[in-house]
């Protein structure tokens, strides 16, 4: 499995949060695609 993205935390700037959520969505898609 690819590594899970690091949570930037509550105090992260909006750009970091957006990047994190994009990476997280991509990560979840990769994992769910591999499972089926």
From Swiss-Prot:
Which organism does this sequence originate in? Oncorhynchus kisutch (Coho salmon)
Localization annotation: Secreted
Chain positions with Tyrosine amide modification = 36
Q: Which family does it belong to?
A: Belongs to the NPY family.
Classification via InterPro entries:
Pancreatic_hormone-like, Pancreatic_hormone-like_CS
GO CC, sorted alphabetically, is: extracellular space
Keywords assigned by UniProt, alphabetized: Amidation, Hormone, Secreted
The UniProt transmembrane annotation reads none
**Name of the protein:** Peptide YY-like
As one GO molecular function, the record gives:
neuropeptide hormone activity
Q: Give GO terms for biological process.
A: feeding behavior; neuropeptide signaling pathway
Q: Where does it primarily localize?
A: secreted
């Amino acid at each position: 499995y690819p590594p899970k993205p690091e949570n930037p935390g509550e105090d992260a700037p909006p750009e970091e949060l957006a990047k994190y959520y994009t990476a997280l969505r991509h990560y979840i898609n990769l994992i769910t695609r591999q499972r089926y």
